[in-house]
Every structure is written in C-alpha cells, then in structure tokens.
C-alpha cells in the first residue's frame, strides 16, 4: 500500500542582494533522475517516478510445511500408501492438505495395475486422510492371508496390509463366496479390492481350483464383473502374474456384495471419505523445509504479495495467478520528466511544463519561488494528498480482482486417453493465454488512470494559483507566474496555502504592470512592433529613392529614354 508522509520543506537560498527583479513563483512536480517505464493503453513506454513489479519470479527452493500440512510419500505414491505396501507404514493415519508424491517412488509388493488409476489417485488425494476402518468379513471354506515372495517385510514373505488374498482351502475347495456389507454409517465408504491374473492355467488351479475364476462386486447402482486374464507376462520381482485393483464407493444406506468363485483379492475394511475436505497432490522432487508459505509449486514455495507469478503453471494453495509475462509494472507515481542537468535550482527558473523537479522530495507537487528575500521550495499538501488518495490501495484492489484461492495441478491421463489429455492441455494453455492478456490489459488500464489522475491534479493546482493571482501576475507559459507587486515569503506562503487576497495588492500590481510595459514588452508585442518597424523602414527607403530620382531628372543629372 502506497503511503507518503507529506512534509513541508522550505529551503531559503540567496539574499536580497542577489535578486532585484519581480517575484516569481513556479509550480512543479516531483521527478527522479531515473524513472521506471510502464505500459499504458496508449503507449508501451511511459516513464513514471515510481512503479511496483506485479509478477513474482523468485521462489524458495523448498516446500513450506506451514500453514498447509504436507505429507511426504517418500518412496511410496498415494496408491501404494492406500494399499499398504511394504515401506509405507509411515502413511498409516496420515492427514494432509497436500500429499507430496516423489518421482522416485517405487512399487514394493506384488506387481499390479489400476485400470482407473487417476480417478482413484484423485479420490485419495482429495480425501486428505488415510483413515482405514477394519471390518470383519466371513469368508467360507477358503484360505486367507495369502503371501508372496514379491512382497517382503523384514525379509519375510508378506502382502498388502489392507488386502486379503483368498485361495482354495486345504481340501482343494473354493466354493462360491457371496458376502454382503451394509453401509449403516453417515459417511461414504471407499472399498479397494482386486483380481489376481495368474500366469498359467496350472497356477490358476493350484491357487483357486476353479478355472476360470470370476469376481463380481455390486452395489445398488453399479456392478463390476471381472474374469481373470490368464497368461504369461514380463517378470517383475520374481512374478509373471498380475493383480488388477478396482475401487467401489458405497454411499450411506447402500450395500456392497462380493461374489466370487476364485481370484478375489478381498478388502480388510474401507476408507472413510470426507466430503468436506479439499486436499490435493503434488508431484515434485523439491524437499520439505521449515519455512512458511501458503503457495506451493512443483519448483518450490512462493512467498509474495504480488498478484501474478511466472514460476510455474502448477500451483497449489493461495497463489498468484500464473501469467506468461516476465514483468508487469504498476505505476504508483506520476509521469516522470527528469530535470535538466545543466539547470540550477534557479539558474533559469521554470515550472512543470518544461520539466520536473528532483529536489521536491517531500511531496508530489509543490512550489518554487524567487523574491527579494531569496529562493525556496515547498511541497503542496492538498494536491499531493488528493493524488495519493486516488492511487492509494490500487495494488490491493488489483489483488482483489485477481486473487482466488485455488490450485492448478498437472492432470495425467492413461495412454488410451491421449486425445482427452491433448484437449485438456489446449484448454489450460488457452486459460493461461487469456489470463496473461487480461493481466496486461488490467495493469495498462490502471497505469493510464494513475497518469491521468496525477496530470489532472497538477492542472488543478495550476488553475487554483492562476485564479488567486488574476491580473496581479502574468503566466510565463512554462508553469511560472511573474508577480507585479512586492511579495515577501509570507505573501508567497499565502499563495501556496490558498489564502492570498489579490485585492490587497491589486493597485500596486496594476501600477507596476503599466510601468513595466512602457519599457519591457512581452514577446508577442515585440514581434508585432518589429514587423511594423521593418515595414515603415522599407517604405521610407523606397520613398527616398524615388524622390532622389525625380530630383536628379529635374536637374538634368539623369536622362530617361523610353523606347517602343
């Protein structure tokens, strides 16, 4: 927020012995030797006294764990954390605003795939918590708690913590399983379950007896039925088989039915879904530090009050809008017209029409004067404050127009959804183009308004002084007035503060004006008289020449012959 402390500065210079002419008072505005270029609606390069950068280009090389809660998945992605893979125990009961997935995350259990991976990932991320509720499932005449050498814990064969691998009983039986669970709670439940795909028919019968197997999971509104796809696949962690994981959401009052004759990877419970939570996920290698920031990107955290940033299009939290421009400057001061280097303070006194004043440090507008008591400079409180009041809060208003608590994450799609991904990227690129254009236009509008306001206040101040002085002074055309009466420092002060009474000095001013005009004419009158004098001189010269010729002819000194 722009704030300027207005102080009246009066610098007395010289003495009455150094100046004997008429008092002069000039109006001017602040200037600096090197201003800042900004863009307006009508000009790409306008120099102003001060401007503020609106685009943040700096970021912290770390993620800030406050005030947003961050959970580092480390070697586990969010899906492995939900399944309960080895090495993911640190995620049990974890709660987050932003789940940090690392590019180095790896699978550590039986090789698997999730046909609707991104949807499951999004549901888990948005939920903001791993709140797993264990349930009792009555499976009949089958073996439970199957394990695999691909899933080691403490060098022992194991399996996903939150899943139960069902196989045939010791009596080689895998009878039809038909199990129903009712959601009698007040929240939605997320069940994650799987289907095992053996690599051979022999493995199928050795594990489940029945070939083919089948898994069907139903609710009142949906049904998913899967027949295992038996076949050899590349070996991963010593396994050629695969598990496909699916998920089902059961709303309050709904039921879920598990029906299988083999190959079911059964849930041990469900995840409690929080419909009010609005968490998200960020894939980045940036470490978590000890800083404080409400905005995170895949390149690090941003701590700024600026409304725009060009660090990353992937941002989470209370972040500036991403724009393509590297710089957008908001004018917070008036148009800058630097003072000529060769001009002293009063070497050739001039007002705002010719240039600005670099010595006017305590205000935007002010006065310079020269009289019998010396010279001086003073800032004008009223006009400066009027301009500040209109500009003050401009940055805050601009932030309000652009600030929105939102997150923009990089969306991922399966390979079969390539066209959707291309369309999504096109839409995101279009949104960024529009925001970049809107940001540039908005800043240009604000800059135009700022310059117009400051120019207007200068004109208002000049008009106020002109109305005060009236015929007691003459406008010199450069922002200065020559005063035709004695005007000491008190008189000058009355002009500045608006208490000047022209009637007091009127007679003296008129008398002095007539005396001065008898000797000293303004530049406009000089030009007219010079032209008249030149014309008369030419006329007299021609008349004398003709008179001489006539006289000479009469005396016989000149003979004229006209031949036809």
Curated annotation (Swiss-Prot):
Cited InterPro entries: Capsid_hemagglutn, Hemagglutn_HA1_a/b_dom_sf, Hemagglutn_influenz_A, Hemagglutn_influenz_A/B
Post-translational modification: Palmitoylated. In natural infection, inactive HA is matured into HA1 and HA2 outside the cell by one or more trypsin-like, arginine-specific endoprotease secreted by the bronchial epithelial cells. One identified protease that may be involved in this process is secreted in lungs by club cells.
Topology Extracellular: residue spans: 17-527
Cytoplasmic compartment residues: 549-564
Gene3D superfamilies on file: 3.90.20.10, 3.90.209.20
Major localization class: virion
UniProt keyword annotation of DNA damage present: no
Site (Cleavage) location in chain: 343-344
Keyword Membrane: yes
Signal peptide start and end residues: 1-16
Record text on subunit structure and interactions: Homotrimer of disulfide-linked HA1-HA2.
Note: Major glycoprotein, comprises over 80% of the envelope proteins present in virus particle.
Protein family per UniProt: Belongs to the influenza viruses hemagglutinin family.
UniProt function note: Binds to sialic acid-containing receptors on the cell surface, bringing about the attachment of the virus particle to the cell. This attachment induces virion internalization of about two third of the virus particles through clathrin-dependent endocytosis and about one third through a clathrin- and caveolin-independent pathway. Plays a major role in the determination of host range restriction and virulence. Class I viral fusion protein.
Record-given protein name: Hemagglutinin
Gene name in the database record: HA
